[in-house]
Amino acid sequence: MSERKVLNKYYPPDFDPSKIPKLKLPKDRQYVVRLMAPFNMRCKTCGEYIYKGKKFNARKETVQNELYLGLPIFRFYIKCTRCLAEITFKTDPENTDYAMEHGATRNFQAEKLIEEEEKKIQQEREDEELNNPMKVLENRTRDSKLEMEVLENLQELKELNQRQAQVDFEGMLGQYKELEQRQKQREQEEDEQETKEMLERALVKRLRDSDSEEEAENAKERSKKHIADKPTDILTTDTSTSSQGLSSAVAKKQSWDRSVGGLSVKGALGSLVVRKKPADSASKPSHAAPPPAAAAAGTQTGAVKPESSITSSSASSNIQPVSCQNGSSLGLLGAYSDSDDSSSD
C-alpha cells in the first residue's frame, strides 16, 4: 500500500516533455457556472424585473481581443425567468463592477451616470488647475461668489421661518374646529327638521285614515239602525246581536224597562196575540137578564176590555225596531204567559 502513495515520480533519462501531446481546446470555450445577478435589471422583451442576488445557471466565456492591464474580461449569458430571453453582461475591472451588454436595462443607471459625470467634471478641473495658475484664481473667485449666494439664501430662509413662527397656529386650529362644529350642528338641525316633517306627514295620513274608518263604522251603524224590522223578527233575534247596536245609556235603560216591565204589564207582544171572542155571546143573543153576579162580572169585564184595548193600541203604537230588538227572553216569556191567561179568561 505504501508503494501507491508515493510523493515523487520517476522520470527516465530520455524524458522529453515536448513530445507529450497536449489537449487543444477552443479559446472561446463556454463553461456552465452558478452565479447571482450582480445588479437590478429589467428585461427588454417582457418587462420582467430581475433583482440583485437572484441565482442563475449561466454560461461563462472569455471575451476575445479585450484586456484591461493584462486582465481578461469575462462574459456571462443568462435567461429571463419569464420569457426565457437571453441577457448578457460582462465584467468591468476598470470600475470594479459589471456592465450590461444586451437583453436588459440596468436599474438605477441614472444615478450612476450622474456620479460619473461629477467625477469627470472634477477631474477636468484638476487637470486645468495643474498647468494654469490663473485658472486656479478664477475658480476660487467663482467658489466664493457661490458661497455668498448660498449664505444669502440661507438667511432668507431663516427670516421666513421667523415670520411663520409669529403666526398663531393654535388659534387657526381653534377657528377651524369651531367652523367644523358649526357645520356639523347645522347638518344635524337640517336632519332633525327633515325627520320632523316626515313624521308630521305620516301623522296626518294616519289621522285621515282613522277618520275615514270612523266614518265608515258610523255609516254601518246608521244603516243597521234604519233597517225596518218585521214585528215577528223579535222571536228570532238574538240578544247578543241586538245588544251590539246600542250606543247610549238612555236607550239601554229604556229597553231594560220595557223588557222587565212586561212581567206585570202586558208587553209588546199584546198586539201580536189574537184574542178569542166569547162563542156564547157571539152565537146566542141574550133574551133573559143576566143574574146579578153575572151582571157584575159583565160590568167588570166591560170595564176591563176598553182598558185592554187601550193598552194594546198604545203598545202597538209604541213598538219600534229598537224595542223589538232589545226584548229579553224573560220579558217575552212573561208577555206570552199574560196573553195565555187573558185568552183562557
UniProtKB/Swiss-Prot annotation:
One of its GO terms (cellular component) is U2-type catalytic step 1 spliceosome. GO terms for molecular function: metal ion binding. InterPro entries: Saf4/Yju2, Yju2. Zn(2+) binds at C43, C46, C80, C83. Residues 308-317, 327-337 have a biased composition (Low complexity). It holds the Pfam family Saf4_Yju2. Keywords: Metal-binding, mRNA processing, mRNA splicing, Nucleus, Spliceosome, Zinc. Disruption phenotype: Morpholino knockdown of the protein causes small head and a curled tail by day 2. Knockdown causes increased sensitivity to IR-induced apoptosis. In double morpholino knockdown of TP53 and YJU2, TP53 deficiency rescues animals from developmental neurodegeneration observed on YJU2 mutants and radiosensitivity. Residues 217-232 have a biased composition (Basic and acidic residues). It comes from the Eukaryota. It is found in: Nucleus. One of its GO terms (biological process) is RNA splicing. Residues 205-345 are annotated as: Disordered. Belongs to the CWC16 family. YJU2 subfamily. Part of the spliceosome which catalyzes two sequential transesterification reactions, first the excision of the non-coding intron from pre-mRNA and then the ligation of the coding exons to form the mature mRNA. Plays a role in stabilizing the structure of the spliceosome catalytic core and docking of the branch helix into the active site, producing 5'-exon and lariat intron-3'-intermediates. May protect cells from TP53-dependent apoptosis upon dsDNA break damage through association with PRP19-CD5L complex. HAMAP family: YJU2 (MF_03226). Component of the spliceosome. Present in the activated B complex, the catalytically activated B* complex which catalyzes the branching, the catalytic step 1 C complex catalyzing the exon ligation, and the postcatalytic P complex containing the ligated exons (mRNA) and the excised lariat intron. This is Splicing factor YJU2. It comes from Danio rerio (Zebrafish).
